């Protein structure tokens, strides 16, 4: 029940992104999210791609062309894996530097959110209390009706529905009243949070350190590019022979087909 109340408050305030403020566990870092997504995506592409290549080579056309695509695919997969291993530390270092540079802003935003959380907590507690009271009242009023249905289900089904409908409507109306009251109570805090966020953004734009941060971010990107260049060059050198081999074999097949057509 408490999770429901918190979820309602989050919808009224800042949306699902504010959920981390109420979570006890630390949210997953940006680098971990990027790394996990990239790993899953690349693995899926490698697995599905290899299946397609294998199916093609097993076909009559694939056997006739004899391009050795599966062998080249495995070589490419190994090279990509090595590239991931070499770029992994560089990428993590880039994100670490970026997080350090923006840590002060994140701390200020967390302070604002924590202040709003403390201010709205009494309203959430009151909302939860009323919610529990109405749920218990509804349960007490419905329980006897359930007993009647159990005693003579077929005979009293229509009568039970007639008794239950007003109770359900009353419960629904009471819940709507509580939700509307909570929305009204939280509205000023929601406005305050939006104003605070707008103020932080304005301070960020006028802050002299913004240009310094931009320079640092550019430096980090340049450093990352310089360190990643050797690994990308290795990948390019690995791909060139594979592409040249495929090009030669395809050209040979086309030439043979042209000779066959000319002879006919």
Curated annotation (Swiss-Prot):
Sequence repeat start and end residues: 67-88, 89-110, 111-121, 122-143, 144-165, 166-187, 188-207, 208-229, 230-240, 241-264
Domain of life of the source: Eukaryota
GO molecular function terms noted in the UniProt entry: amyloid-beta binding; apolipoprotein A-I receptor binding; chemorepellent activity; cholesterol binding; cholesterol transfer activity; enzyme binding; heat shock protein binding; high-density lipoprotein particle binding
Keywords: Cholesterol metabolism, Glycoprotein, HDL, Lipid metabolism, Lipid transport, Lipoprotein, Oxidation, Palmitate, Phosphoprotein, Repeat, Secreted, Signal, Steroid metabolism, Sterol metabolism, Transport
InterPro entries: ApoA_E, Apolipoprotein_A1/A4/E
A single BP term in Gene Ontology: negative regulation of tumor necrosis factor-mediated signaling pathway
Intracellular or extracellular location(s): Secreted
Leader sequence residues: 1-18
Coiled coil: none
Short name of any one Pfam family annotated for the protein: Apolipoprotein
Sites bearing Methionine sulfoxide, chain numbering: 109
GO CC, any one term: extracellular vesicle
Post-translational modification summary for this protein: Glycosylated.
Region spans: 10 X approximate tandem repeats: 67-264
SUPFAM superfamilies, sorted: Apolipoprotein A-I
Keyword DNA-binding listed: no
Keyword Signal recorded: yes
Major site of localization recorded for this protein: secreted
Function: Participates in the reverse transport of cholesterol from tissues to the liver for excretion by promoting cholesterol efflux from tissues and by acting as a cofactor for the lecithin cholesterol acyltransferase (LCAT). As part of the SPAP complex, activates spermatozoa motility.
Similarity comment: family membership: Belongs to the apolipoprotein A1/A4/E family.
Subunit composition and interactions: Homodimer. Interacts with APOA1BP and CLU. Component of a sperm activating protein complex (SPAP), consisting of APOA1, an immunoglobulin heavy chain, an immunoglobulin light chain and albumin. Interacts with NDRG1. Interacts with SCGB3A2. Interacts with NAXE and YJEFN3.
Protein name: Apolipoprotein A-I
Lineage: Eukaryota, Metazoa, Chordata, Craniata, Vertebrata
Gene name for this UniProt entry: Apoa1
